[in-house]
Amino acid sequence: GANKDYLNDLWEYDMSRNSWTQCADMPVAGRKAAVGFAVNGKGYITTGSVKDGSSSYCVADTWEYDPATDTWTRKDDFKGGVRDGALAFSIGGYGYVGTGCNSDATGSESAYKMDFYRFNPNGAEGSQWEAVSGYGGEKRYFGTAFVIDEVAYICCGRNNNTDLVDFWKFDGSNWTQLRD
């Protein structure tokens, strides 16, 4: 809620010991409704909302966490702009982020998003994010994404106080609508 702290801490879970160990905190203000994905043994956090006094605003910064060194590195800002409640997944050595809501949108800018972008962890600075076309689903925020055998599936979420039930899959090249 509005009166709660936004967090920037990171924890690692050891299944064999059933225990948690605190890792290095993100070196930025705490946030909520951010998304994360993992590629090549590193974790990535992007978008979300941060607090500024009693209000909050959406962000687009992207951070890489390296568990081998317990360090964070700033990467290119998410090319799709500020938002929270997006979707994220990784397939084929790339991270993907899309949809979400820019609660700061004004005028003719739509608050709800239906775009997707691919993150290349090996890309040169300034060119790590690239737009991905072909998604024909609804604009949404707080949807669900999962990956099975290098195919991403997305579904659910909300748009203008409407629950969404469309179901899509993405193989890294093509989007296909499945049965709702």
Specify the residue positions occupied by each region the protein language model found.
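Kelch-like beta-propeller repeat domains
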Residues: 1-180
